[in-house]
């Protein structure tokens, strides 16, 4: 059964438009609370479950936090409020505090006028599809407030930020520190604006910050992992050794070196796999996505590392990692999973893992990626009407077939619907940039004509 509200990363949309409205989010909190309260762990003991709510810095977070809190309380679920907190911080604290679930109010890399809700299970993982389906089923039932003696209570979690800072630092090798390194940290005016600079500073780095002055409206606005030009300029202007850019909820990153070169998630995955081979002797396999650059796949296979592609979305990378019993996976967008360190993608932890790999090897990122030249990719986002039947369109199919025939095995064509926005993503990868651009633009033109 198709889900009505949950996408690849929770529920997301424009604030004020269904489903991101206070009345719906209150009912969502109630529905999630009823599902949690009915779970075996809590139903058998009769204990009242507790959930943790964190958020990013969007002005709408206050409204949605209050709505969620009310819904959970009406379902008889206690609430702990973490305030502004990176998504991976909520996942960690949920697991560390043995809570029933964690909830994040964020639209990640989207503009301030969007927002969303995503859930984490007690073990710090994103909720399975079947639990999200149970919540959707509960949404169809009437809201029946728990008796007064069973209503949930709410309280602030003291030092949530400090607890998460210590967790992040604990993932960095005790033998290393960052003394002598000048580091620019771009927090996208988002959830990590306070914690990320502290992590790198307390490990010894000379930290220069940008994107650390949230006002409720400037999250991801010209800064952060989706706008890395700001980081490139800051690294060059300050003659820094390296720059790290996080997105609005800090679950992904981009890294820039002293020369202004940008490194994406595909390249950083290769660096981390190399580091594991050097320290452990062997890495059985790694997981990317349908969008992962072919050059990385070839380079990993040349090192004897099996490579598997998952559907786009970090939850699907995680599923493949668990299926194969592996630890390392990534998306080119900068979501990096290292399951021996954390249960979910964490931009701060991922940056520390890359820095540790550089220190262990004594080499720069450019040197660690010698011999790995990414194939040119052209990605075009085409807005379309929700529900448009692009898969069954003959004109689109012909355009794809013609491009694949012209590439003749020296590239790839990938078209997919976004799980978070009403757009169709057209990606072409080729040995030569002009070919990637030509075929992507041609297919995108056909898609626009067919879906408008």
UniProtKB/Swiss-Prot annotation:
Pfam family, one: PGM_PMM_IV
Residues forming the catalytic site: 108
Residue(s) carrying Phosphoserine: 108
GO CC terms: cytosol
Record carries keyword Magnesium: yes
Ranges that cross the membrane: none
The record's free-text note on cofactor binding: Binds 1 Mg(2+) ion per subunit.
InterPro entries cross-referenced by the UniProt entry: A-D-PHexomutase_a/b/a-I (IPR005844), A-D-PHexomutase_a/b/a-I/II/III (IPR016055), A-D-PHexomutase_a/b/a-II (IPR005845), A-D-PHexomutase_a/b/a-III (IPR005846), A-D-PHexomutase_C (IPR005843), A-D-PHexomutase_C_sf (IPR036900), A-D-PHexomutase_CS (IPR016066), Alpha-D-phosphohexomutase_SF (IPR005841)
GO BP terms, alphabetized: carbohydrate metabolic process; peptidoglycan biosynthetic process; UDP-N-acetylglucosamine biosynthetic process
UniProt entry keywords in alphabetical sequence: Isomerase, Magnesium, Metal-binding, Phosphoprotein
Cofactor: Mg(2+)
Binding sites annotated in the UniProt record for Mg(2+): 108, 247, 249, 251
Catalytic activity, EC: 5.4.2.10
PTM comment: Activated by phosphorylation.
Catalysed reactions listed for this entry: alpha-D-glucosamine 1-phosphate = D-glucosamine 6-phosphate
GO molecular function (one): magnesium ion binding
PANTHER family: PHOSPHOGLUCOMUTASE (ALPHA-D-GLUCOSE-1,6-BISPHOSPHATE-DEPENDENT), PHOSPHOHEXOSE MUTASE
Entry's family note: Belongs to the phosphohexose mutase family.
Function: Catalyzes the conversion of glucosamine-6-phosphate to glucosamine-1-phosphate.
The protein's name: Phosphoglucosamine mutase
